[in-house]
Amino acid sequence: MKDLRDVIKRPVITEHSADLMAEKKYTFEVSPKANKTEIKDAVETIFGVKVEKVNTMNQKGKFKRMGRYGGYRPNRKKAVVQLTADSKELDFFEA
């Protein structure tokens, strides 16, 4: 990826991701072409924290129907980023 801001699309805020925040694990939706190294570099430079490890998962788009027409939602890639113990917490998840 050319620009690090193109790697991270948005944070994923769910019940499960809120529980993971207590362990300094944050969930992001990322570009499907991004790899773990690019995701780690993007989080470290944008938020100014140290990343311990990155776990990624690809989610296939679900089949959805609108009347008699069917189609698929887009595929997504999520990344769970674990910060080091001495790094600060990301506060943009707090509302």
From Swiss-Prot:
**Any matching Pfam family:** Ribosomal_L23
Gene3D superfamilies linked to this entry: 3.30.70.330
Which GO molecular function entries does the Swiss-Prot or TrEMBL record give?
Answer: rRNA binding; structural constituent of ribosome
Q: Which GO terms describe its cellular component?
A: ribonucleoprotein complex; ribosome
> Could you mention a single GO BP entry for this protein?
translation
Query: What keywords are annotated for this sequence in UniProt?
Result: Ribonucleoprotein, Ribosomal protein, RNA-binding, rRNA-binding
Q: What does this protein do?
A: One of the early assembly proteins it binds 23S rRNA. One of the proteins that surrounds the polypeptide exit tunnel on the outside of the ribosome. Forms the main docking site for trigger factor binding to the ribosome.
Subunit structure as annotated in this protein's UniProt entry: Part of the 50S ribosomal subunit. Contacts protein L29, and trigger factor when it is bound to the ribosome.
Q: So what family is this one in?
A: Belongs to the universal ribosomal protein uL23 family.
Record protein name field: Large ribosomal subunit protein uL23
Species name: Oceanobacillus iheyensis (strain DSM 14371 / CIP 107618 / JCM 11309 / KCTC 3954 / HTE831)
